[in-house]
Amino acid sequence: MQTEHVILLNAQGVPTGTLEKYAAHTADTLLHLAFSSWLFNAKGQLLVTRRALSKKAWPGMWTNSVCGHPQLGESNEEAVIRRCRYELGVEITPPESIYPDFRYRATDPNGIVENEVCPVFAARTTSALQINDDEVMDYQWCDLAAVLRGIDATPWAFSPWMVMQATNREARKRLSAFTQLK
């Protein structure tokens, strides 16, 4: 995969430039655009992934299905599709917005900061996973209700962005709609 960049944003969320992705994530990470996606299978189960140990931020942490950064000229939805192909090897239904104004800042145990305007999406797949080991070290298809109970009981076991997204009432409601079989 070619070198990725992040789109830097000012406090109002207006793009101000770009920076190479790896260089952007430091103890002083500037505000930038990202996305987060929750992927469901034909049985209505959620894909929960464990970040590879080689990841700069939150290595080895359980999180929602796919996260990433849109590139210049790419929509958030196109970025979700691209990263699902790259990280999971799957085709997905068109991503649906479930938490469009999500924004957060969090510091991992190594001091790396995430500082993102991060719209949240959900999608479905019927494809078999072809996991990219550089991105994902483990995964589980899970009942959404069980994952939400786990987040409520042990939030420290999940990425902070997943916890914040899952504890938003409207996002939970929209995620629950994806557990219904179509």
From Swiss-Prot:
Its cofactor is Mg(2+); Mn(2+). Mn(2+) binds at residues 25, 32, 69, 114, 116. The active site is at 67, 116. Binds 1 Mg(2+) ion per subunit. The magnesium ion binds only when substrate is bound. It is found in: Cytoplasm. Keywords: Cytoplasm, Isomerase, Isoprene biosynthesis, Magnesium, Manganese, Metal-binding. It comes from the Bacteria. Residues 30-164 form the Nudix hydrolase domain. Its main location: cytoplasm. Its EC number is 5.3.3.2. GO terms for cellular component: cytoplasm. GO terms for biological process: dimethylallyl diphosphate biosynthetic process; isoprenoid biosynthetic process. Gene3D superfamilies: Nucleoside Triphosphate Pyrophosphohydrolase. InterPro entries: Idi_bact (IPR056375), IsopentenylPP_isomerase_typ1 (IPR011876), NUDIX_hydrolase-like_dom_sf (IPR015797), NUDIX_hydrolase_dom (IPR000086). It catalyses: isopentenyl diphosphate = dimethylallyl diphosphate. GO terms for molecular function: isopentenyl-diphosphate delta-isomerase activity; metal ion binding. Mg(2+) binds at residue 87. Homodimer. Belongs to the IPP isomerase type 1 family. HAMAP family: Idi. Catalyzes the 1,3-allylic rearrangement of the homoallylic substrate isopentenyl (IPP) to its highly electrophilic allylic isomer, dimethylallyl diphosphate (DMAPP). This is Isopentenyl-diphosphate Delta-isomerase. It comes from Escherichia coli O6:K15:H31 (strain 536 / UPEC). The lineage of its organism: Bacteria, Pseudomonadati, Pseudomonadota, Gammaproteobacteria, Enterobacterales.
